[in-house]
């Protein structure tokens, strides 16, 4: 399995380790490639859109021509995991003119709605598709404030969606790569198999 991490900005190394662990659990080797330029995404089986700064990520993927390749990847049914800023970039509406949302996940989001850096928090959250709660790390997390047709809510915190699936895209408001638990990557890239802790 070739996994591309959109590496224009954000948590690259952590996602690489998590996808390697998820693939290994299924007896499948993973080659992780960093995507900084156009021409790499078409060769990838799965994509990771990491956290970071959504305005920067949006601008750089558009400038490099990666945005259209990501859209084509999803249109072909190939999996994507988008986390935190990745969720914002992949949303239908980022409610920020500086973010050119890709429209891959039929949700609207409010950037940093869970608060500033000092308001970061961690929570054990039950999640559809996982046998045990997931330890989620929220850092300047976005809020999914509108869920459109065709979107499955996978997890909530205080009644607010924090993880969703829209076709081949799993998107989270939190950072699963900042834990030693690769089950979210597993859920995104091996959806047909049971995910156990």
UniProtKB/Swiss-Prot annotation:
Catalytic reaction list: aldehydo-D-ribose 5-phosphate + D-glyceraldehyde 3-phosphate + L-glutamine = pyridoxal 5'-phosphate + L-glutamate + phosphate + 3 H2O + H(+); L-glutamine + H2O = L-glutamate + NH4(+)
EC number in record: 4.3.3.6, 3.5.1.2
A Pfam family this chain is assigned to: SNO
Residues the record marks as active site: 84, 175, 177
GO cellular component: cytosol; glutaminase complex
Alphabetical UniProt keywords: Glutamine amidotransferase, Hydrolase, Lyase, Pyridoxal phosphate
Taxonomy, superkingdom: Archaea
GO molecular function: glutaminase activity; pyridoxal 5'-phosphate synthase (glutamine hydrolysing) activity
Function as written in the Swiss-Prot or TrEMBL entry: Catalyzes the hydrolysis of glutamine to glutamate and ammonia as part of the biosynthesis of pyridoxal 5'-phosphate. The resulting ammonia molecule is channeled to the active site of PdxS.
Protein name (record): Pyridoxal 5'-phosphate synthase subunit PdxT
Protein species of origin: Halorubrum lacusprofundi (strain ATCC 49239 / DSM 5036 / JCM 8891 / ACAM 34)
């Amino acid at each position: 399995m070739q996994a591309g991490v959109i590496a224009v900005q954000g948590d690259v190394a952590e996602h690489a380790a998590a996808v390697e662990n998820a693939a290994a659990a299924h007896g499948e080797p993973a080659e992780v490639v960093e995507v900084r330029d156009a021409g790499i995404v078409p060769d990838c089986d799965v994509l990771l859109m990491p956290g970071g700064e959504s305005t920067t990520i949006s601008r750089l993927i558009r400038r490099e021509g990666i945005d259209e390749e990501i859209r084509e990847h999803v249109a072909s049914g190939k999996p994507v995991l988008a986390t935190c800023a990745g969720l914002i970039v992949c949303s239908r509406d980022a409610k920020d003119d500086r973010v050119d949302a890709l429209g891959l996940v039929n949700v609207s989001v409010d950037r940093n709605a869970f608060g500033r850096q000092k308001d970061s928090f961690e929570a054990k959250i039950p999640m559809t598709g996982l046998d045990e709660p997931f330890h989620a790390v929220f850092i300047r997390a976005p809020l999914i404030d509108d869920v459109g047709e065709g979107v499955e809510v996978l997890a909530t915190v205080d009644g607010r969606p924090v993880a969703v699936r829209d076709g081949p895209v799993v998107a989270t408001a939190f950072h699963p790569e900042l834990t030693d638990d690769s089950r979210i990557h597993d859920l995104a890239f091996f959806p047909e198999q049971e995910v156990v802790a």
